[in-house]
Amino acid sequence: MRTIVAKRMTGKVALAAFLTICTLAVQAAGQMSASGADRFTIRRSQVSPGVRLTRIIDSRGPNRISVLTVDPSRAPTIDVALARNKLPGNQRTSGMAAEHGAVAAVNGTFGLPGGRPVGLFAEDGDLKTSSLTWGRAFAPTHDKTNYFFGHPGFSVTATGDTSGTILRVHTWNEGPPAKDEIAGYTTAGRRMIQPPTDACSARLLPRSKQAWAENQDGFERQMIVDRVRCSDQRMKRLGGIVLATPTWGLLAPKLRSLLQGEPVMMRWSFGWPGALDVLPGNPTLLEGGDNVGYSCASPFCGRNPRTGVGLDGEGPVLLVTVDGRRPGYSVGMTLAEFARQFERLGASWALNLDGGGSTTMWVEGRVINRPSDPAGERYVSSALLVLGGQDPGEVEPLSYGSLAFGTSTGGRTSTDSALAVSSSPEGPSLQSVLSGELAADDPGSTGGLLDAIDGGDVEPAARLSPALQRIADDFEDGVARP
């Protein structure tokens, strides 16, 4: 699948398009009512400048549809949030929204039990995890002019200044590496995703903050090699990055060629210039106006509560939820129906996010939809937020070459210290654990996605990465691996 780049109109043109779409929708609703169809009941309200909430009742389902229309040219910013800012972590969408000062939010991507996102996830340029690198994702650029839908081009390298060693890092904050892989681990993984035992490892400590790479195509950060060893004991991260490969692996000699005290340049890219945040999902529903939603035998494709993100032509961003599993109130949508719903809203691009009992929309301090779990709002791995202004966590664009070797005084910065593992980490709550189990069994959420993958309904099994195949196998065996 090709990557889709959607360019957003700015200024008066975008505003005019936005108002025109709203006017046409009102006229269309009036025409249906006048003709006696009475299928749709539509209510609209202004949330904040550039953010509008539309509530739709479709009597044909019936279905209750909630749509946030976000026009970034009028101040709001689309942002992502990782639950509790750690891996794995579970948190309610409402909690993440309140912590980040959002005006509105929907739940984010699929999560494994415990809360690790199923997909490549990045926040403010910081790569959190790389699982499911063949999957699809949504990414806004920092200047709010482009939006990416499609397959991210994950790439991480470590280049030694003295030895000349160039290491390709295959996974990031996942499980143990395969024999032909080098894995990277940061303190974002806390105690649940740690460097492996029986590995050759190198610990890199930061000597600078992250900065844009050339043409803003990814990021770079100057590090220094603190230690290199092969051992049956796991290497501590100490606020830095640990690169590891099996002691018996094919890449062990290459990793051992790094020299203690050697400057190393870490570079990482999502394949989308200017993108700071990446939120994974599956599958894409619309591509450049083409409906690519499909039907399959898996329950994942059947009627479920749904959450998705789309782009309204070349104008506003759409965050959409559909309630489900409530006969007589809202039954939910199949993937094909969800794609058609985005078409009716005027979208040209759309991506399916975590659904089922995870489906949640939060606006101005309250959940405004009806989550399908008996306990109400589910704990989830991530959220897609609407901020009222600029994202305070985004890095300023820096010129390429600002991290030349030797320009830093070294040592650990305040940011690095903040990443240190807490000596008494917060344990998961009972509700959080139960939410993870519910997601694992939910046909509209993670369990349904992985069952569809394993059955070949979402992606041919031959194209699965080794890491994702392990995840699918673990779900089939009833094992929840960290």
Describe each region flagged by the PLM.
Residues 482:
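Short carbohydrate-recognition loop motifs
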Residues 1-9:
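N-terminal secretory signal peptides that target proteins for export/translocation
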Residues 26-479:
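Gly/Ser/Thr/Pro-rich low-complexity, intrinsically disordered segments
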Residues 14-27:
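Bacterial N-terminal signal peptides
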